[in-house]
């Protein structure tokens, strides 16, 4: 079994994946994009008869899927699968699954951080410091 993992978020769990896949004698290849994702043409270039893809936001369209003759399963790291041509996959017996809730913690943390940033005027302070000014709110004491 050959597996291609392109989702950058999986890099921190690489040792766990390696241990898990070694139990199944799977050949795992990690290729991460320099930016957020691979486009369809880049996916064609890195695909090498893998049976399973674990992807992030990579473009998995009909152009790529036509060249992926050995592909049997696509796993989307995260909830949304709008980057995957699901109709083509259904018609060609390629199963697609996702991992809803996997990124929920990170989305929640980011949301709280943005709220805190607004509450503390962090961006206003960054802008004023970059302009050579020091914005200081009046003291309440």
Where are these regions (language model features)?
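Phosphate/diphosphate ligand-binding glycine-rich loop within oxidoreductases
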Residues: 51-130, 140-141
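Rossmann-like dinucleotide/phosphate-binding beta-alpha-beta segment
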Residues: 1, 137-141
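N-terminal glycine-/charge-rich "phosphate-binding" loop or analogous flexible N-terminal tail
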Residues: 1-50
């Amino acid at each position: 079994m050959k597996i291609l993992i392109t989702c950058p978020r999986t890099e921190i769990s690489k040792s766990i994946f390696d241990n898990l896949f070694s139990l199944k004698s799977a050949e795992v290849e990690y290729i991460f994009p320099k930016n957020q994702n691979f486009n369809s043409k880049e996916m064609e270039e890195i695909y090498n008869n893998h049976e399973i893809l674990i992807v992030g936001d990579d473009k998995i369209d009909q152009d790529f899927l036509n060249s992926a003759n050995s592909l049997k399963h696509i796993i989307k790291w995260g909830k949304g699968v709008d980057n995957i041509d699901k109709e083509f996959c259904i018609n060609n017996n390629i199963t697609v699954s996702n991992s809803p809730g996997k990124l929920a913690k990170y989305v929640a943390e980011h949301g709280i951080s943005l709220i805190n940033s607004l509450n503390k005027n962090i961006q206003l302070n960054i802008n004023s410091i970059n302009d050579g000014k020091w914005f200081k709110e009046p003291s309440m004491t």
